Amino acid sequence: VEWTQQERSIIAGFIANLNYEDIGPKALARCLIVYPWTQRYFGAYGDLSTPDAIKGNAKIAAHGVKVLHGLDRAVKNMDNINEAYSELSVLHSDKLHVDPDNFRILGDCLTVVIAANLGDAFTVETQCAFQKFLAVVVFALGRKYH
């Protein structure tokens, strides 16, 4: 993937200004609520029986923050995102057995939450760069699947 200087600038600034403790939990909770089959990977996280239980689940919130912080790795390695996510891809494939399509689903939920929070500040240019960035991250996370 080739990045323009404008895309690099948008991504770096955009990610750095996200409120991880707000956006991460909301995005993961939305994913688990809207796509309930994704809950199967979170059986050890406690009560996921209702949308309110999911939204109020501290383990889900903490994992949402962790996932969002995981994007920092891609920002720091934009010229080699595939390599930066190699170990995470193996972990999700070989140990956790996560369906790789769920990475795209979570990215979609993340985009919805960010757009809702930023409103007009989530410009077309920002979304364009962010969607490209997420597509590369999703590809990298699914790369080690066999």
Swiss-Prot record:
GO terms for biological process: hydrogen peroxide catabolic process. GO terms for cellular component: blood microparticle; haptoglobin-hemoglobin complex; hemoglobin complex. GO terms for molecular function: haptoglobin binding; heme binding; metal ion binding; organic acid binding; oxygen binding; oxygen carrier activity; peroxidase activity. PROSITE patterns: GLOBIN. Pfam families: Globin. Red blood cells. InterPro entries: Globin, Globin-like_sf, Globin/Proto, Hemoglobin_b, Hemoglobin_oxygen_transport. Residues 2-146 form the Globin domain. Heterotetramer of two alpha chains and two beta chains. Involved in oxygen transport from gills to the various peripheral tissues. This is Hemoglobin subunit beta.
